[in-house]
UniProtKB/Swiss-Prot annotation:
SUPFAM superfamilies: 6-phosphogluconate dehydrogenase C-terminal domain-like (SSF48179), NAD(P)-binding Rossmann-fold domains (SSF51735). GO terms for biological process: mannitol catabolic process. Its EC number is 1.1.1.17. NAD(+) binds at residues 3-14. GO terms for cellular component: cytosol. This is Mannitol-1-phosphate 5-dehydrogenase. NCBIfam families: PRK02318.1-2 (NF002646), PRK02318.1-3 (NF002647), PRK02318.2-2 (NF002650), PRK02318.2-5 (NF002652). GO terms for molecular function: mannitol-1-phosphate 5-dehydrogenase activity. HAMAP family: Mannitol_dehydrog. Belongs to the mannitol dehydrogenase family. Keywords: NAD, Oxidoreductase. It comes from the Bacteria. It catalyses: D-mannitol 1-phosphate + NAD(+) = beta-D-fructose 6-phosphate + NADH + H(+).
Length: 379
């Protein structure tokens, strides 16, 4: 089986690309980093350093790479592969959608009606459905109808912490990852036979898993980063080692967890164990996870479907406590990082228009009581 994977960054190489290659799939990476592309094509392999209680290096083979700016190369791949995955970041999906539309149209014209499945592996809710909508903006109604027949747009939830690591001179493509990984896909959205990929779990209730991960791992990770930054530490593992930080992170995940328990009938004890597992992952002594990396892009993280506002809206829906989630929103608004364009934009907007206007603009919150709480805590 042949797959095209967009994004040869740490997640692409250390998570999705690895799972595909481990299952005997030939993976062609598409990326804009020509140095990395050349390294993949020359070395035809790279190491994945898995760090934890039993650290080891596993080698990924059966790979090639193309430059995603080379439209012809991308189109040729899309015309023939059976699976396409992405790990490019939510913001990039919209940029590559016109090229995907052109490539899928070319596949149609070439007469290839074999099933093709596309899975966006991004930190967002129903990322593939979003990607599909962006692709379809560039296609005619008749093209859309034809593509619907043989292309599956499969939503997924992905979870693996893959922080940047020191360059290994002997293997510049080597990537460091934690032991834990979770890739859950919506089995109802595939076209044709579902590919047999070790480590890819199937479900018909994806939103429960998407929100479990978003409301727990992502929410907790972000709170750890903000509190760690306030405490003056560099790494997430240092932040979570501070008792008051760990307590606040856990309390926030418990607030968002109460929404999940109510919404999806999760077992409270099982969810409490899931929270403990995540706290242990944050404390992994082998992972150098920078608080600025985790805290970056506050505008995206304050959006209505993301890790702070979505669980907060859930607490309002069910009449549940949300003190810690509100604190999280305040910390996101207070996040300052001169090297992060979103942080700069947010700070400037607050300076020009005030906190209440920023809350309304970026979060979509309409509950006046909560907006007032945020403003009071910010000032």
């Amino acid at each position: 089986m042949n797959a095209l994977h967009f994004g040869a960054g740490n997640i692409g190489r250390g998570f999705i690309g690895k799972l595909l290659a481990d299952s005997g799939v030939f993976v062609t990476f598409a990326d804009i980093n020509q140095t990395q592309i050349d390294q993949i094509n020359q070395n035809k392999q790279y190491g994945v350093k898995i760090v934890g209680d039993a650290s080891r290096v596993e080698v990924v083979k059966n790979i090639a790479a193309i430059n995603s700016k080379d439209e012809e190369a991308v189109i040729e791949q899309v015309k023939s592969v059976e699976l396409i995955t992405t790990a490019v970041g939510p913001n990039v999906l919209g940029f590559i959608a016109p090229l995907f539309a052109k490539a899928l149209a070319a596949r149609l014209e070439a007469g290839n009606t074999q099933p093709l499945n596309i899975i966006a592996c991004e930190n967002m809710v129903r990322g593939t459905s979003f990607f599909k909508a962006k692709i379809f903006e560039n296609l005619t109604a008749s093209q859309q109808a034809e593509i619907e027949k043989f292309v599956g747009f499969v939503d997924s939830a992905v979870d693996r912490i893959v922080p940047p690591a020191e360059l290994n001179e002997a293997d510049p493509l080597e990537v460091t990852v934690e032991e834990f990984s979770e890739w859950i896909v919506d089995k109802t959205q595939f076209k044709g036979q579902i590919p047999d990929i070790k480590g890819m779990e199937l479900t018909d209730n994806l939103m429960a898993f998407v929100e479990r991960k978003l409301f727990t791992l992502n929410t907790g990770h972000l709170i750890s980063a903000y509190l760690g930054k306030q405490a003056g530490v560099k790494w997430i593992k240092e932040a979570i080692a501070i008792d008051s930080v760990k307590a606040a992170v856990k309390a926030t995940m418990e607030e968002s967890g109460a929404v999940l328990i109510k919404r999806y009938n999760f077992d409270p004890q099982a969810h409490a164990a899931y929270i403990e597992k995540i706290l242990k992952r944050f404390a992994n002594p082998y992972l150098n996870d920078d608080v600025n990396r985790v805290g970056r892009e506050p505008i995206r993280k304050l959006s209505p479907n993301d890790r702070l506002i979505k669980p907060l809206l859930g607490t309002l829906e069910y009449g549940l406590p949300h003190k810690n989630l509100v604190n999280g929103v305040v910390m996101a608004l207070q996040y300052r990082n001169e090297e992060d364009p979103q942080a700069v934009e947010l700070a400037q907007f607050i300076a020009d228009n005030g906190v209440a206007a920023a809350v309304e603009k970026y979060t979509g919150l309409t509950n006046q009581e909560v907006i007032d709480q945020v403003v009071a805590l910010y000032n």
